[in-house]
Amino acid sequence: MLCWELANRRKRIGPNRFGFPIAILTRQQLIEVLYTALSDKSKVKTGKKVVRIESEERRITTWTEDGSEYEGELVVGADGVHSVTRSEMWRAADNQQPGFIQEEEKYSLSAEYSCIWGLSTPVPGIRQGEQIIRSYDRLTFLIFPSQNGCLGWFAIQKLNRKHVYPDIRPFSQKDTLARCEALRDLPIWNDVKFGDLLTLTEVCAMTPLEENLFQTWNYGRILCIGDSISKLTPNIAQGANTAIEGAAAVANGLHQLLHHNGLNQPSYDEIQEVLGRYSQSQRKRMKKLHWISHMVTRLQSREGLINKFVGRYIYSHTGNSTFYLTGKMIAQGPVLNYLSTPKEIEIGLRASFDQYGKDGGDMPWKTTIMFIALLTIVVLIYSFI
């Protein structure tokens, strides 16, 4: 079991590493902030579910459920794990270049875990700002602070078998309630049990946790980003972050192309070059994050003999390494390179990570040694299997 007093650490480490204090907010709040800051809101169309995309060499056209039609140069799909954009990209490739998308890729999405997530009002026994990871065999509780002492939480549990797309069914409210009741009496932190969170929960749902890094990210004038092409579990909390990174990296490539072309319309081949370069570089980064996410998910749920041993006897002694390593992962991501970087970020995010662990919140030497020991044990055990 791990617990951080995030409220105190974010005041000290946040400005040193990122240039600004760390703030915790819901995705809805983030979207509201971003939307409010838009100078031209007319380009944001809500209630426009895309049902069809036709990609041609000179143009691309999308049709929505309400009959609207939009024509342009490029479609970037950030429409989640059940992506219509991805399906339409596959359809276009199958029609225009049969065999370009391998059949095994279309069935590479799978789920081995489920996740119950919820938002609770302040729970007595959990102090404001505390972030908790509680591990059991085949089960992990993640509790993190939100605004005004409220708590966001995940209960991530190993499924009885691996489900492969399209055999990944959603869970009903009845499934959610039954699973919650089965976990109600499990301790979370000191005298706090999972049932104490449930009693104060305002919203709760259950979903399968799909995992996959697709091979093909773009075809024609179609590009996929975020969960539509790279689906992580929430254990390392990088799903939304990497989707935003993807949008930034695409914007960098397009800005460079438009700046180079001036008033000339980008050609089909030029757009292909930008999309291909983006897919290659971002997929390389995501491959590393997928490996980390896969490993952490199974370590925290103590899946298998190795993870059970490491999870019980080593992981709980690694201190704040997760906090620091997550910060380093974020620092290595792309940023918008055509906007001036605020001085605070330039100093905090770039310079401090060049000397990782030597700024205002250095990683304890005991933690470093513990992590080296953990990795050594894992490598040795795997070498004899």
Curated annotation (Swiss-Prot):
Enzyme class: oxidoreductase
Membrane topology category: Single-pass membrane protein
Biological or metabolic pathway of the protein: Secondary metabolite biosynthesis; terpenoid biosynthesis; Mycotoxin biosynthesis
Swiss-Prot/TrEMBL cofactor(s): FAD
Domain of life, source organism: Eukaryota
GO CC terms: membrane
Annotated keywords: FAD, Flavoprotein, Glycoprotein, Membrane, Oxidoreductase, Transmembrane, Transmembrane helix
Binding site for FAD: 27, 227, 240
Residues bearing carbohydrate: 320
Localization annotation: Membrane
GO molecular function: FAD binding; monooxygenase activity
EC number(s) given by UniProt: 1.-.-.-
TM segment ranges: 365-385
Biological-process GO terms, alphabetical: terpenoid biosynthetic process
Similarity field: Belongs to the paxM FAD-dependent monooxygenase family.
Function of the molecule: FAD-dependent monooxygenase; part of the gene cluster that mediates the biosynthesis of the neurotoxin verrucosidin, a methylated alpha-pyrone polyketide that inhibits oxidative phosphorylation in mitochondria and thereby causes neurological diseases. The carbon backbone of verrucosidin is synthesized by the HR-PKS verA, and further modified by the other verrucodidin cluster enzymes.
Protein name: FAD-dependent monooxygenase verC2
The encoding gene: verC2
